[in-house]
A protein has these predicted regions:
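A short hydrophobic beta-strand segment most commonly corresponding to one strand
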Residues: 4, 8-29, 134-142
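Glycine- and acidic-residue-biased ligand/ion/polar-headgroup-sensing regions
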Residues: 8, 82-112, 116
Length: 142
């Protein structure tokens, strides 16, 4: 996926691991030795499909005591759900991990405090975990 990150943006780059990055532009940045970093324009063009568009996602909401879960993106590799919590909610699935990125607010998980931009991982074998507080987070699962 060709993309850029501009000043002042916060992104959550949730993707299948590929271990490949092709740099098509680098803003003149330099490495530790002062050299410009290599660009990979030809390689990037070889593997890019510029005609493909993502399917539109019709967000689905599940309202529970203490919060609202909204599925914002799903594909064969992962699902991303936004959680808006104002109380205590159960998070976690028995068949997959849950990666949590807190976007706003604060809360606790098992007595441990978390806040804006904190990230934590709930293993599949943890079962349901209680999150408490007033916060917004992205939950990523397989």
């Amino acid at each position: 996926t060709i993309h850029a990150i501009g000043k002042g943006l916060l992104i959550a780059e949730i993707q299948q691991n590929s271990n490949v990055t092709y740099r098509v532009y680098d803003y003149g940045r330099r490495d530790a030795q002062g050299n410009t970093r290599p660009l990979h324009v030809e390689k990037a063009l070889e593997v890019s499909d510029l005609t493909r568009a993502a399917d539109a996602v019709e967000p689905t909401q599940v309202v529970v005591d203490g919060g609202v879960f909204t599925e914002v993106s799903t594909c064969q590799y992962f699902t991303v759900t936004e959680l808006k919590a104002d109380g205590t909610v159960a998070v976690g699935k028995p068949d997959t991990f849950t990666a949590v990125l807190v976007l706003e607010g604060e809360g606790t998980i098992d007595g441990e405090a978390f806040g804006r931009y904190d990230t934590f991982f709930i293993p599949a074998d943890a079962g349901e975990v209680k999150l408490s507080g007033c916060f917004k987070a992205l939950l990523s699962t397989l």
